[in-house]
């Protein structure tokens, strides 16, 4: 099949993108719209699901128009999405009962702490591969069923939200499910997204009864779990809808798993790091679900139709690109492009370390009460030092993960494939290579998350025949090798660890 294209909807934390790819994996059209971030209280982060859906329709329509294509020119559509972000909606009206609770949202931290106090953390880890955290969908869904009650009272029916969910009147899903539902009318998720809910047993490959009971979440509201690339097809777009054609929707992957797939990390030991709002370092572990002893997550990487699940180890860093946004928020820079110029204007940070724990710390620390910290400042500190320290924090956090990854897997990564908006910054890429003392490879196509969704969708309909076809598409834009002496990198990293210690458990409750 060569006379068509594949489309990928990339629904991210800050906006929604639609990219059309050709058979070489090259971008034919790329359109994007931001959506509003809602912060109703400190530590709370919400998105409007209806705004996301409207933006999705807008970027898909604009992308096809920009490429001079009709919807019939698409062989398939794949979806990739911000993971863990949770929506509950009315099955009849299709309207959400509340804003989506975003993966960064920390409102359920105390609930997670109660799980720890009651000795349930290890059992959750055994079933899900996850560290119990407010990051995941389980406590978000529980909160919505408990606390969205006032929004429901305007409806004709006065029964509880849980009763309505048990009766099939309310549906829950991550953003992939929300988009699949609006595109096709089907209530579906894929294994990679299901594995991020803290409700899915990644060994038995099913929603877990014990977890559903713990969080009092009715099974009836959960989506059907399907392969990430599904020859059986999730559904088709409505020919009477906004596209005017019945396009098959055949794939879904959480954004980081999609990047793993787009970077063609198909074999055990292959690893990538994506630098976005947060950073996410994943290593393919094949058919083995490797348990972590060093604060990493065991997660599902992807599943192709008729094939076994492929697992991955993951290090989740909550704040990287968001730290650059913070520099803009406090007027230290005007735009992200300034960071390289400012950071390279000084040789060092002059002893300044920045720990961007604005929403707590993820792997390997898993401290929801850690907070952002700047240490080591003097009267001689200038904004260039702070900007450089912020970029260095991205590299140090990645080294945290790389060390844990090697300890858990027994595999030393020789070349780390990198992607995401921040890797356009050559200064950061070289710094990252120096700090982790590992070669970096940046691909020509930098939209690897969307590319992974497109690859998965295209495989399902025979647009590409095999994984080997995809491997042939992968091309290096630039490689980076360590230039820093290993002893210097170790010394800098040691001081980073001291700075992290000062950020931990800062946001204690009275």
Curated annotation (Swiss-Prot):
EC number: 2.7.1.30
GO term, biological process aspect, one: glycerol-3-phosphate metabolic process
Pfam families linked to this entry: FGGY_C, FGGY_N
This protein's pathway: Polyol metabolism; glycerol degradation via glycerol kinase pathway; sn-glycerol 3-phosphate from glycerol: step 1/1
Reaction it catalyzes: glycerol + ATP = sn-glycerol 3-phosphate + ADP + H(+)
Binding site for sn-glycerol 3-phosphate: 13, 83-84, 135, 255
Chain residues that bind glycerol: 83-84, 135, 255-256
Record-level Gene Ontology MF annotations: ATP binding; glycerol kinase activity
Described function: Key enzyme in the regulation of glycerol uptake and metabolism. Catalyzes the phosphorylation of glycerol to yield sn-glycerol 3-phosphate.
Designated name of the protein: Glycerol kinase
Taxonomy of the source species: Archaea, Methanobacteriati, Methanobacteriota, Stenosarchaea group, Halobacteria
Record gene name: glpK
